[in-house]
């Protein structure tokens, strides 16, 4: 275990190198890691995130440092070691270090560094008195759904989807989901806490106190993020838990008794003010029919009525991304330059096994020869068994 105190990061002298014995993020094998030049780039109730440079490669990395309760295994570490996906931030290594107090132990997660977030990108367009270009909304939300389709097929629910947890490389347009600090493998008939997820993005069943919720809470959150990127502000800006429900009702209208039953049957007898829905095309005035249709299918009161992540990926809203001639304009610098879209269809066998009946919609014709050359011919495809796709913790 490292003797470096958490404060050591803040007192690094220029050019000073810290050496750690770390465990590899994939294999768990012990190896040496050296890094230098640390600066704090984020902190919260969980701990601190430092940006650092790995030595001698000079590669940027992020180190997330959290206080570890010795009585429990760290769920975030367990899940980060399981997930491997182009749209999920990669765990490079991890190690433990002592804190200021004798009994304090910190877990340090060494992850790839991604320079931007969707939250900051959205604020950039706000300052320019405009909203994010719709092609970028499509690009980011599609990649988020791709990450969710993958983790949901493993039984993992992220439980804190919000713009701040969506990392972005503005030069490539690649999105990576981060912060699995609230993530959990959901097991049927095992209760889960309802007080998770950041307020503006909380699914109504969570506000109703449900403990038997599903991965569809992440789908609701994604609908909220998508609408926010199109609006330039949160769709449901509640000031408290119950006010959050009021904001949702102002748009979706009062849920029916049946809808309330699907969220939490214990609330059946509550009397809610009767409010008519406010159509999405009036809330999102600039949105086209495909955008409106998708958001309406994501923001359903009844969890089972919401689209699954993989179903959302094949929605016509994302058809532009499947067109091989679509290019990504540089919206930040207004140079008039365009670039290729990042890889969006480099699916592996696991991803193609999630909903094999959708593969012909999922994989555009121009990509099929590339996948076939890797042994993934969607016309002659044997999917993995669902149980083999589920994540299992030690």
Curated annotation (Swiss-Prot):
Its EC number(s): 2.7.11.1
The organism's place on the tree of life at top rank: Eukaryota
Database matches in PROSITE patterns: PROTEIN_KINASE_ATP, PROTEIN_KINASE_DOM, PROTEIN_KINASE_ST
Biological process according to GO: cell differentiation; positive regulation of developmental process; signal transduction
Keyword Kinase: yes
Gene3D superfamilies reported in the protein's UniProt record: Phosphorylase Kinase, domain 1, Transferase(Phosphotransferase) domain 1
Residues bound to ATP: 41-49, 64
Name of the featured protein: Glycogen synthase kinase 1
Species this protein is from: Pyricularia oryzae (Rice blast fungus)
Originating gene: GSK1
